[in-house]
Structures are given as structure tokens and as C-alpha cells.
């Protein structure tokens, strides 16, 4: 298995990682901005292409062209069979995790395993909504151990109107902050 550890932001860069990680074969550690931009994450495509040179699954365009697409129901493990598994572990905020997921989604490469170590800004006393939603440990050492060795559990990926992955939470508001009238539709079901 190849493991990419993405240290997003100063607080994540200051986290002390086990010495064994620095010497482990197949583990690469990257220091990135607190919320990495598309250009900061280009290297992810190099890794996904190397480990899965040809993706046998239909592209988004091919799926959209089909007259009937099966309902997906519950999330499942990705069907792709890479040369070796790839686990990407994000150390950082919910926004950093969203940025990484967005990059993978836009590259049509959502097959790697994703781990998350919530690293919050102590000065702002932030809490990771993603960690709370997924019952992840908030202690960085425990979260890192789970991210490195835990069992993969597929979860749905939610994106906003701008095509960005939402990790944690999002709000729906009017541009001016006023009352909002409308409805939320997921597939064929009206939620609100």
C-alpha cells in the first residue's frame, strides 16, 4: 500500500509524527497550505495515474450518456483495482479535507482510500464537524493510528452548487442573509 500524508497548514506541520513513518517504505509526507488549491494537489493525479493507468469504469460523461443509470443506493467500495492500494491521509481542517476530495472528484479519481486527522486551530477553538459526523477520534495520535490502520468504510460524497466536496457541514443561505424560500431535492426526493 502507498500512503500519502498531507499536512495542511501550520498546526498540521507542527504535529509530531511517529519516527517510523518517516522511514517507512511506501509513505510520502507533503506539507501544504491550510486549504490547498488545485495546483498544490497536482501530484495526486501523478499517484492515481501511476497506480491505476487505465480506469475500466465508465467516466462521468459515459454515465450521463446512458439512457438509464442504476440507482446507487448505499455507498460501496470503489470497483477499481489499482496496482496497489493508495491511502491519502489529510491532516488539517474540514476545509482541507474538502479541497482534497474536490480535487480527486474533479479528476474522476475517487477510488483511493481517504483518512482524516482533524487538526484544529487552538487559538480559535475550532471543532471538526467531519470528525464528529464520522465519529473520528479528536486526539491526533489516535486519529492518525485509525487513518493508517483502520478499515475503510464508504460514505456518500456531497457537493455544493459550485461543485466542491463538502466535508463537515455547509449552510444554505440567501446572498444577502435574508429569509430563503425554496426546496432541496436529492435525486427524486424532496427533502425540504
Regions from the language model: what does each represent?
Residues 1-24:
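N-terminal amphipathic/basic leader segments beginning at the initiator methionine
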Residues 2, 86-87:
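Structural motif
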Residues 9, 30-46, 50-82, 91-98, ...:
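Catalytic core of DAGKc-family lipid kinases
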Residues 17-18, 101-103:
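Short amphipathic alpha-helical segments
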Amino acid at each position: 500500500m502507498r500512503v500519502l500524508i498531507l499536512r495542511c497548514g501550520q498546526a498540521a506541520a507542527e504535529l509530531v509524527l511517529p519516527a517510523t513513518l518517516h522511514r517507512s517504505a511506501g509513505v510520502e509526507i507533503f506539507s501544504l497550505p491550510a486549504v490547498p488549491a488545485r495546483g498544490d494537489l497536482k501530484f495526486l493525479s501523478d499517484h492515481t495515474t501511476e497506480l491505476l493507468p487505465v480506469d475500466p469504469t465508465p467516466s462521468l460523461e459515459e454515465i450521463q450518456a446512458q439512457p438509464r443509470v442504476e440507482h446507487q443506493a448505499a455507498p460501496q467500495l470503489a470497483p477499481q483495482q489499482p496496482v496497489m492500494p493508495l491511502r491519502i491521509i489529510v491532516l488539517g481542517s474540514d476545509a482541507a479535507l474538502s479541497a482534497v476530495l474536490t480535487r480527486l472528484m474533479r479528476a474522476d479519481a475517487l477510488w483511493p482510500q481517504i483518512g482524516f486527522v482533524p487538526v484544529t486551530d487552538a487559538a480559535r477553538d475550532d471543532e471538526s464537524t467531519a470528525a464528529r459526523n464520522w465519529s473520528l477520534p479528536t486526539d491526533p495520535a489516535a486519529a492518525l493510528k485509525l487513518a493508517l490502520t483502520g478499515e475503510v468504510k464508504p460514505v456518500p460524497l456531497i457537493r455544493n452548487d459550485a461543485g466542491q466536496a463538502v466535508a463537515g457541514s455547509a449552510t444554505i443561505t440567501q446572498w444577502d442573509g435574508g429569509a430563503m424560500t425554496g426546496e432541496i431535492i436529492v435525486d427524486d426526493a424532496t427533502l425540504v
